[in-house]
Amino acid sequence: QAGALFLCDQVIPWDYGSCSAYEKLEDGSYGYVYHKGPIEAFGGNEEYKYSAVREYLGQVAEEWEEQGYQMKNVRTGRTYTYTGQTKERSFEQFSEQDLTAHPSSYQQMTDRVFLLSVEEAIRYRDELWKFSGMDWLRPASTRYWLRTAMGREGGEGTGQAYAVDLVKGCIAPVDVGDTCGIRPAFVVTQAASR
């Protein structure tokens, strides 16, 4: 069955679900304690398969299905890592040659709600910087993760994944412990035309 890709029209800010609460501290005194939200960092390494953002999107998929959304499972396994970055202020006019693909060990996995890969970002480049409203301008949502790891020739393990930078107008690697928002995507099954 054919499907239509939907890319959320807003970035979920990296501080979503984060809060400071006035609590009793270990020493018995009271003070503010910061609690991280579910997507404050990509994860412990550049592997989307085991990332905090993928875990969160799995929960989102379950919630959406309970609300009646019928989303397709999409192959989100990695076949490539990338090196390089697009030029700042190039936005959707970036050159694909600035990003170099490197074959990677294949990961078998599917998701119903997911982040775009670098390959998909290239394919849907005209949509990467389009939004409804101006909410993305707040500091916690000025860039959003892609699911592709930054690699290196001959191996992985860089501790970086790619992100779309909305202010600088580029696609670039970011340390996985750094803060980026997320822009979920999903595919809805389309009925065959008659």
Regions found by a protein language model. Give the residues of each.
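Collagenous Gly-X-Y triple-helix signature in extracellular proteins
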Residues: 1-194
